[in-house]
């Protein structure tokens, strides 16, 4: 009996304890004010997340890497004027581009188009050949490219030697070339003199002006016309006092020549 009554007495509460259960002064507002907020409810989750991330183990927090977008290549003035651009086109064209000439126009045009296509594909692979040519044509209207193009054209022009620019006509030729040149000039003079004599012999001079024309002046006229076809070297070798007529004699010769021309045109 004693054993059975012990647990029962242990479970029964004291009268004071029972009174405390029903003796409270606690309002509804105080109860709602002590309710945990929503942010407080998330704190345990955040701490759990940090604990799972490995911060408690001394590990660094995971860094999120965002991939940067690669810049898109453009066919602009800078790319066109760079070394793979037009400068490379000019170098390779001088060294590799050869044409066969007449009778091979079609193959030469195909070779030229293939050359341009390979160059443009290496410069800007993103564009097709026709599209790339259209872009290059639009860029060619810019002031910068027009200025550089003029410079390239001036570079390709044949340069005049410094001797010619200084006004010196002296040209050093081999001895054989000078001999051939002298013989050719002499032959031209003889041919011109013969033609002049033939033309003068065909002139019809009326009787009224027969005395005004002196046959002794015909060699002088022939010699004067002959000098027009002389080379500069031969003319420079002539002596200054070779019996050249003075101004009055030149005027007389010119008047006689005009009279001859007028007579032939009137007849």
From Swiss-Prot:
It is found in: Nucleus. Keywords: Cell cycle, DNA damage, DNA repair, DNA replication inhibitor, Meiosis, Nucleus. GO terms for cellular component: replication fork protection complex. The keyword Cell cycle applies. It comes from the Eukaryota. Its main location: nucleus. Belongs to the CSM3 family. Component of the fork protection complex (FPC) consisting of tof1 and csm3. This is Chromosome segregation in meiosis protein 3.
